């Protein structure tokens, strides 16, 4: 999650009173080390303000990791029932939809977790290179496409957010990264898919990464 993305989430969450948010499920939460150590702005901008307003946050991930409150697979009916039993009023679904083969299925399962009036805070890359963790389907929707995916909801707020970060930032820290592109340039036949990804990444030397951010209410 980018710093600008975390700041946007803070503002989006602050637009609602605590009783509209609590309990809140943070889907695909990753570990406490990621939230507080590697990307501490997630904790500072999102979860500290929520706790200050007495919003109960439940961190959910399919992996057993430190800081995960509920280990659950969002494609498993039994796990979905366990999550639904928590009676969440809101969900964070951040940078998940591009990591599943069937984003429409994941969207349906997310909607099934909340009752009518439940809130979904969704972020997904809009302009960003391939990043496998563990997979990336290159799903890059705009807000309208995201609204089509989450049918049965009302779009309350959305933006395509500039992060102020680009591939230049990585290259400044590790200039040798450019050597990878130079090495691959004349040999696309070795692995054409990897060659395409390598050449495409150069676009973000000039362009910033952008994120689709949206808030939905279940009808």
Model-predicted segments: where are they?
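A general structural signal for short secondary-structure junctions and capping/turn motifs
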Residues: 14-18, 49-50, 204-206
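Conserved SAM-binding loop
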Residues: 22-132, 144-147, 216-217
């Amino acid at each position: 999650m980018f710093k600008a993305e975390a700041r946007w989430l803070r503002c989006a969450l602050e637009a609602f009173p605590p009783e509209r948010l609590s309990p809140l499920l943070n889907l695909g939460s990753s570990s406490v080390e990621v939230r507080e150590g590697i990307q501490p702005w997630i904790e500072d901008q999102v979860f500290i303000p929520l706790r200050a307003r007495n919003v109960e946050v439940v961190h959910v991930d399919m992996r057993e990791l430190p800081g995960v409150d509920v280990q659950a697979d969002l494609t498993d009916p039994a796990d979905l029932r366990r999550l639904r039993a928590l009676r969440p009023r809101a969900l964070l679904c951040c940078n998940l939809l591009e990591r599943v083969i069937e984003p429409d299925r994941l969207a349906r399962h997310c909607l099934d977790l909340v009752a009518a009036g439940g809130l979904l805070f969704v972020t997904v890359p809009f302009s960003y290179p391939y990043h496998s963790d563990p997979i990336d389907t290159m799903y890059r929707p705009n807000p309208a496409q995201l609204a089509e995916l989450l049918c049965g909801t009302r779009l309350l707020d959305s933006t395509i957010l500039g992060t102020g970060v680009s591939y230049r930032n990585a290259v400044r820290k590790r200039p040798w990264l450019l050597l990878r592109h130079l090495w691959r340039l004349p040999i696309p036949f070795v692995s054409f898919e990897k060659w395409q990804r390598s050449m495409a990444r150069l676009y973000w030397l000039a362009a910033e990464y952008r994120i689709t951010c949206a808030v939905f209410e279940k009808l």
